[in-house]
Amino acid sequence: MINRNSGKDRDRSRSGDKELRINHRIKAREVRVIFNDGTQSVLPIEDAIKCARDVELDLVEISPNALPPVCKIIDYGKYKFHQEKRQKEQRKNQKIIKLKEVRMQPKIDTHDLDFKYKNILGFLKEGNKVKVTIRFRGRELAHTHLGYGILESILERVGDSNYVLESPAKMEGKTMFLIIAPKSRK
């Protein structure tokens, strides 16, 4: 007979491992209990659960890998709420830095260059890195000095102390590029 649900049951048990064990779900026979006043003692699991029930709180397994496992007498609902709140705050504080690319050709007009420069500044103010790329086609490859000149003029304009040149002007194949990044704010 083939058990078709075995994979689903296995997945359910894995997701349950992320939750902390509380009260009768704690498997150890003896646990180190941390009381509300900070005192500790090693007790059989039944006595520890009884102590938690006496003060109308939960026995929560904090460190299951310790010998004996460490449990704390706390209100599990409040504890879980504070953990989720802390994780939400950490996610909010994380900033994902994206790499934005601004492309141009070596025969770019001054007005177009001004427009591209405004885009570059906007991306940098948002906190993104900017890759400025110049594509050369055909005979333009003989005049790479024009590309270096354009990149230098952009760097002079950006020259603010809030931005840093992460990668100097390089030539790869038919493209020339440099990367400008905002300084990290710590």
From Swiss-Prot:
The record's Gene Ontology biological-process terms are: ribosome disassembly
- Enumerate the Pfam families for this protein: IF3_C, IF3_N
Q: Which PROSITE patterns match?
A: IF3 (PS00938)
The UniProt entry, under InterPro entries, shows: T_IF-3_C_sf, T_IF-3_N_sf, Translation_initiation_fac3_CS, Translation_initiation_fac_3, Translation_initiation_fac_3_C, Translation_initiation_fac_3_N
Keyword set for this entry?
A: Cytoplasm, Initiation factor, Protein biosynthesis
- Coiled-coil-forming residues are none
Location(s) in or outside the cell: Cytoplasm
**Region feature Disordered, mapped onto this chain:** 1-20
According to the UniProt record, one GO cellular component term is: cytosol
Extract the GO molecular function terms from the UniProt entry. Answer: ribosome binding; translation initiation factor activity
Give the protein's function: IF-3 binds to the 30S ribosomal subunit and shifts the equilibrium between 70S ribosomes and their 50S and 30S subunits in favor of the free subunits, thus enhancing the availability of 30S subunits on which protein synthesis initiation begins.
Q: How does it assemble?
A: Monomer.
The record's family statement is: Belongs to the IF-3 family.
Q: What is this protein called?
A: Translation initiation factor IF-3
